[in-house]
Curated annotation (Swiss-Prot):
Source species, domain of life: Bacteria
Major localization class: membrane
Catalytic class of the enzyme: transferase
Protein location: Cell inner membrane
Keyword Hydrolase among record annotations: no
Lineage per the UniProt record: Bacteria, Pseudomonadati, Acidobacteriota, Terriglobia, Terriglobales
Membrane topology qualifier: Multi-pass membrane protein
Organism in which the protein naturally occurs: Acidobacterium capsulatum (strain ATCC 51196 / DSM 11244 / BCRC 80197 / JCM 7670 / NBRC 15755 / NCIMB 13165 / 161)
Gene label: mraY
Cofactor(s) needed: Mg(2+)
GO cellular component: a single term: plasma membrane
GO molecular function, one term: metal ion binding
Protein name (record): Phospho-N-acetylmuramoyl-pentapeptide-transferase
Length: 377
């Protein structure tokens, strides 16, 4: 909105407004705007959640130290979504389709999480939507994103080819060649790509959801992942940097940098209230929205295979649950004292603060490694 008003409309009459053409300037201001929104309306949101008695239910089989957190306001992800989406609307070029894709992805997964949280609050138990219902909605939302990207591919704005880290010349195609030139069936050739998008986005949203078990853990890792994505999105949309780093040149994805910057600012603002001891929890509305947003950005900028490093802690947390469940079903034995992984470290004697900070450090190392792959091609 501000980009349209101040640059596209008023720039001819007031030349200093040319500064709004620069992506770095608008990204910085989107991040600051998101931070201020989160900080300023955070106390109001916390007060209203308490007023409506929207508190966290703590499962009895979890670590006993967590029982004191029962009743802490939850569904704080609403605050995160507002703080991300408003600055994106203000500072980005809204004619860019990729901006709408990442915003609508955030809204869709946030809505799924909101429904899940609402059911938990109403029934006062730690079970919301059924696993089947939640998975169905996530698959439908992810499939819609995949289809939208296939349409953009047909318009020449996107490529469904996969970019492989460390192998600049390797670009596997996610399509069925036999269908590409068949009238009325060409779009069906991209079904493998849509399936891949579903796996990436659904996996990421649930991985962030599993990580959200300690004060500030998931949001701190999100700040790091979103920061890495901000860099990757900027260079992917910058013609000179993309050519130099031998990335696929995608000029239109540059505007998504503003969304990533807003995600960083909103997450920092939320961490102010979510830091141990937390005054508010993000709930599923926050974790699913952030996980969906992170994965959608990665898909849009063709860095899906870097996502396990960009969000390394999220992957480890999800793997710990998969391994724990698989081991128990096959061998009737558990690998970890408790899954997800952060609870295992709590039960072996690490304090909550130590687990959080050490996981943040690991997340930073993963993200830095992801950024180094830009040059290792």
């Amino acid at each position: 909105m501000l980009y349209w008003l101040l640059y596209q409309k008023l720039f001819p009459y007031f030349r200093p407004f040319r500064i709004f053409r620069y992506l770095t300037f608008r990204t910085a201001f989107a991040s600051l705007t998101a931070l201020l929104i989160a900080l300023l309306i955070g106390p109001y949101v916390i007060e209203k959640l308490r007023e409506f008695q929207i508190g966290q239910y703590i499962r009895e089989e979890g670590p006993q130290a967590h029982q004191k957190k029962a009743g802490t306001p939850t569904m704080g992800g609403v605050l995160i979504c507002i703080a991300i989406l408003l600055p994106t609307l203000l500072w980005s070029d809204l004619s860019d389709p990729f901006v709408w894709i990442v915003m609508l992805s955030t809204l869709a997964f946030g809505a799924i999480g909101f429904a899940d949280d609402y059911i938990k609050v109403v029934h006062r138990r730690n079970l919301g939507l059924t696993a089947r219902a939640k998975m169905t909605y996530q698959i439908l939302a992810s499939a819609a994103i995949g289809v939208a990207l296939v349409v953009l591919q047909g318009q020449g704005s996107y490529s469904t080819d996969l970019m492989v880290p460390f192998a600049k010349s390797l670009r596997p195609r996610f399509s069925i060649p036999a269908l590409l030139h068949v009238p009325h069936l060409a779009y069906f050739a991209f079904i493998p790509f849509v399936i891949f998008v579903i796996i990436v986005i659904v996996g990421s949203s649930n991985a962030v959801n599993l990580t959200d078990g300690l004060d500030g853990l998931a949001i701190g890792c999100t700040i790091i992942a979103a920061g890495a994505l901000t860099v990757l999105t900027y260079v992917s949309g910058h013609a000179v940097f993309a050519d130099y780093l031998e990335l696929q040149r995608m000029p239109m994805v540059g505007e998504v940098t503003i969304f990533c910057g807003a995600m960083v600012g909103a997450s920092i603002g939320f961490l102010w209230y979510n830091a141990h001891p937390a005054q508010i929890f993000m709930g599923d509305v926050g974790s699913l929205a952030l996980g969906g947003a992170i994965a959608t950005v990665a898909v849009v900028i063709k860095q899906e295979l870097l996502l396990p490093f960009i969000g390394g802690i999220f992957v480890l947390e999800a793997l710990s649950v998969i391994l724990q469940v698989g081991s128990y079903k096959l061998r009737k034995k558990r690998i970890f004292k408790m899954a997800p992984l952060h609870h295992h470290f709590e039960l072996i004697g690490w304090s909550e603060s130590k687990v959080i900070v050490r996981f943040w450090i690991a997340a930073l190392v993963f993200a830095l490694f992801a950024l180094t792959t830009l040059k290792l091609r």
